[in-house]
Amino acid sequence: MSDDEPLAIAYERHDRVALLLDTIRYVLEERSLSAEGWDDPQCRGPGMYLVVVSGRSVAEHADPLGDNRWPVEESRDVLADPGAFAAAAERVAYECDGTGVVSVDGVVQERMVRFRDPPSPGGEYADWMGTRHMSALDTSRRDTVIAALTLSQESGRVTVFRDGTYDSVEREAIAARWRAD
């Protein structure tokens, strides 16, 4: 459905979806700022990859990733209880691999997945990008993907990918204007 159709919803400009994306981004930033040891090359911080989708299913371009699951019994809806979402995200960031899938209504799917490469992956990858970030960049180009968000377990960088572009904030710059240090 295109934007010029009367019943089309432009999710990328929808207020509730913007709140959803902001909430997820803030939780990732908080995970980054609360973790310690980022300067230690032997330390592995929390890592996360979440995708916000508008379609009914990601089955045509994603596969379940083993037994990795989002703890839906603790947090099923991002916006219904952001505190519960943050607590679940903390656990997932350290214990699970794969991509969490969130519908535009804020519901988190239980299965963690691995997105397959799009038919024509592309774009320029930045030097700092690992496989999680390259996948997020490519995945963000899919029609049903509103945004992909990552937290780098190597550096604490938080990145929002949309339509093959990205806005990335290094850990040191997260909330820098509000920090007293």
Residue map of PLM features:
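Divalent-cation
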Residues: 2-181
